[in-house]
């Protein structure tokens, strides 16, 4: 009976082929991202200018089978983000999520945000190279789980390919595309969903 139960349990785990959508984040001004919610805490984040999709898998939950190949899998909690899109740092700071950024695309002296300066001074955040020349060895050895880039990275497609070849998902931050000033501000909701805040 126990063996049957285990088989049943295994089948149930393996059969998680589709996500059941429960709703979407309401946005008033932002037009360049969406966040969709699914049963059991899964979230799909989409950056619309490049149609990239990122599935956030809650801690302890399986990665769903049968996903489209272009969906990047992000395992929660994200703790080793490489933040190159420096404009997003103030949003991380306002969410109290700077501790999820392990790698910086700027040196300590170039940060104007005190939380970032302090994190680098303490060694909690380390410089991992600018957008066009990341320190791949450092990122891989320290377990980078996501690179958040700005639009400049589109001029260095080889960097994106290299990061992806090391299984580091690449996300481009498009808040500067927003026409409405409050659309830019609303990107804090995107990063809130990303960091679980």
State each model region's role.
Residues 1-197:
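N-terminal ligand-binding lobe of clamshell/alpha-beta domains
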């Amino acid at each position: 009976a126990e063996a049957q139960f285990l088989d049943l349990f295994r089948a149930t785990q393996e059969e998680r082929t589709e996500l059941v959508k429960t709703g979407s984040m309401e946005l008033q001004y932002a037009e360049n991202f969406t966040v969709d919610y699914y049963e059991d805490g899964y979230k799909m984040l989409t950056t619309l200018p490049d149609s990239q999709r990122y599935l956030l898998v809650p801690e302890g939950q399986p990665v769903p089978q049968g996903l489209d190949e272009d969906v990047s899998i992000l395992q929660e909690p994200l703790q080793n983000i490489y933040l190159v899109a420096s404009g997003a740092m103030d949003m991380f700071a306002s969410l109290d999520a700077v501790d999820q950024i392990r790698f910086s695309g700027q040196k300590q002296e170039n940060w104007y945000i005190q939380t970032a300066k302090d994190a680098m001074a303490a060694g909690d955040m380390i410089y991992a190279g600018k957008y066009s020349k990341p320190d791949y060895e450092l990122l891989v050895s320290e377990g980078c789980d996501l690179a958040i880039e700005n639009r400049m990275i589109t001029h260095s497609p080889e960097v994106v390919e290299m990061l992806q070849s090391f299984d580091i998902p690449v996300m481009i931050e498009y808040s500067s595309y927003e026409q409405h000033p409050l659309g830019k501000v609303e990107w804090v909701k995107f990063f809130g969903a990303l960091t679980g805040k």
